[in-house]
Amino acid sequence: MRRREFISLIGGAAAAWPRAVRAQQNPALIVGYVGAQSRSFYADRLRAFHEGLAETGFREGREVLFEYRWAEGHVDRLPTLLSDLVASRVDLIVLPDSTAGSIAAKRMIPTIPIVFGTSADPVQSGLVDSWNRPGGNLTGMVLSNTELVPKRMELLHQLVPAAKTVGLLVNPDNSGAADIKVGQKAARDLGLELRILNVTSDNDIPKAIAKLAEEDVRPLLVGSDILFYVHRERIAKLAAQQKLVAVYDRREYVQVGGLISYGASLLGFHRQIGVYAGRILKDEKPADLPVMMPMKFEMAINLKTAKALGVTIPQSVLATADEVIE
């Protein structure tokens, strides 16, 4: 029977066998992977994660085994799923895209190493002590697209130069406040007014987009939020129906009919989470691994959508695109 580090959910101590020592006796370490959505939602992300993990010498079914847990969109299930992984005595927990899950893990699990992916400021949310020296047992990646709002606003201004008002779709329950603050400044700098559209559920999406069309506001900036990403095809379709010129934060919107996107590479983000997981399995300490942000940004353009909207994409914009859908 494999000897493992026993870890109590209520803050108990670990029988501190280094993972490298245990790996010599039985090479199959166990990683718990907790997704906030369904497994199918993570297909491409998981591939990228495993590519990053393999870079460090760990392959599923060989050097490492996996315990997968899926919340199926029910964030309130995350604490239960985390408890289950602790009972399974995993060596590492990966929370690739849930701020709520990461905060719960921080509170519940004081010793098992945790790699997170979040859109929140990790210091302000209490996940780590600092970006460079996280302290504790958590580290990971931050996918914050708020800093790119001015660039997206500028893109909208280039596409609809005569517009005086820009719509901003945000979820006030998540990262909406940050998007609004940055968006207001970006709009002012371009001499534009900002029309804020608050959306907290999928039922609000068609109402918000219809409201913008009723007010004859054509440019739309879709904020960074998991709710919008899950319903990206619906949002892209509604925007097209209302003849809105919309800019998004991820290329996946463009691949399902959205006009244009600019943001961090999502697959690169998950690949780096895999690299960090591997480094920790090699006994590096989360406390010493700086919280990272993506370094690669990409633009995607759907020319078919542009034609349907009657929008001309400037050559200067086309020249910088990483993906162009004809």
Descriptions of predicted regions:
Residues 1-326:
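Short hydrophobic alpha-helices and adjacent helix-cap/hinge residues
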